[in-house]
Amino acid sequence: MTQKLPLALFLMGPTASGKTDLAIRLRQKYPVEIISVDSALIYRGMDIGTAKPDAQELALAPHRLIDILDPSEAYSAADFRRDALKEMADIVAQGKIPLLVGGTMLYFKALLEGLSPLPAADPVIRQQIELEAEKLGWQALHDQLQQIDPVSAQRIHPNDPQRLSRALEVYRISGKTLTELTQTKGEAIPYRVLQFAIAPKERAELHRRIELRFEKMVESGFEEEVKALYARDDLHPDLPSIRCVGYRQMWDYLDGHGTLDEAIYRGICATRQLAKRQITWLRSWDDLTWLDSENVDQAVETLSNAIASNEISCV
């Protein structure tokens, strides 16, 4: 008889949709352990602007894969998949269920479908690219990438030499673009995955939540948090950490661009745009059960029934 794969739960949703609150309620009812799926929560010292769970919430429901990196460090979808699979195996070994919670859809996709193996770094080609950059400038190399791989060029900033160099290197080694290779699925996740997404039914309600949360962040000291990052000499606005929604707008304000009120407004607008992209991605997701942010009790019941039907007992 074939042994069943272990169960894992995905709880996705746009920013400010109530994912954390729902996850904590599940943690109190079932033997689940939470793994964060968020490209901003990985950074230490970025607590307020990321709406990171506070000490009380973490005491009720510890989260794995938060506060694992300094803001100066980079982290890829492949890094996340490796780390998440390790944490999931540890949770299952304890007889519990991995509950993956967050809004970084690329991480969920990488975990669920796997990633195609990219060619190993080639020091000779890497050096050629760096010499070209010294001679022509990174903008010229970005223009090259725009010609061969416009999709990657759109998401890689000209002032992000590490990712720009890698995209060009992959093409020169393999003859295929980074976009082509990453669209090829890798090894599927070795779990039975139940997938859920939570969001308000009305867009206006999500916008209201986003605005209220951003204003609360500012009241809680968000400006001071970004000032502490700004004061460091190893951080700059082209790093993935500083490009996080809210941080980039506050950083621009500290750089002398506009007023604080304008930075707050731009931060709210950027957060709305992020939520729109997240919802667009989720609408194309297969095998997804939607939950209503404004009816958390019903959401808990839906998840409870799904867990129970998969023969997982309550604690």
From Swiss-Prot:
It comes from the Bacteria. The keyword ATP-binding applies. Residues 38-41, 162-166, 243-248, 276-283 are annotated as: Interaction with substrate tRNA. Its EC number is 2.5.1.75. SUPFAM superfamilies: P-loop containing nucleoside triphosphate hydrolases (SSF52540). It catalyses: adenosine(37) in tRNA + dimethylallyl diphosphate = N(6)-dimethylallyladenosine(37) in tRNA + diphosphate. ATP binds at G13, P14, T15, A16, S17, G18, K19, T20. Substrate binds at T15, A16, S17, G18, K19, T20. Pfam families: IPPT. Belongs to the IPP transferase family. Catalyzes the transfer of a dimethylallyl group onto the adenine at position 37 in tRNAs that read codons beginning with uridine, leading to the formation of N6-(dimethylallyl)adenosine (i(6)A). This is tRNA dimethylallyltransferase. The gene is miaA.
